[in-house]
């Protein structure tokens, strides 16, 4: 069974969509999967079982990235096309069946609307597939003999960020004397281009307790470290 799975550009929305992808994999062990998504989300799909290809949809002028997707997929016959972006060009692919988001129910959570695409009665919980390298790296980076507090102090938009002094105060309360994670190490996560923002906070973390992972590991390794 050949599946084209068109999902989000945003990382968070793409992760939510992994729930129905996992359900399809469990229901169809012989599934052969092609995934189309934005560049930020692409790394989380690298180890999906039965993956044939990840098509990265870099945004182009006049929405030409959709035409590019059509050109890459038109020569295949798809047993199932799932399009969570509702791109009109996916209607023009050779396929047996196509499922899309349709009109979202504003009274429901996004994850509920995604689960309804394949007619699930319950919400499909997100699923990430890490590799052996990611699992091993997490064991090396995250100590098992002390508590660890994970902090993600950055964002892609400054208005979304919390001030570094607030994070510093939170760390002091949580890991200080009588805190719920007393003397914990602090693992700091973020993208490489967000490093200057993260450094402001990391400089305030006591020596020997900061685990600096900002821009140093892949998304799948971030997942295994947090697990």
Give the residues covered by each predicted segment.
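Catalytic machinery of carbohydrate-active enzymes
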Residues: 1-227
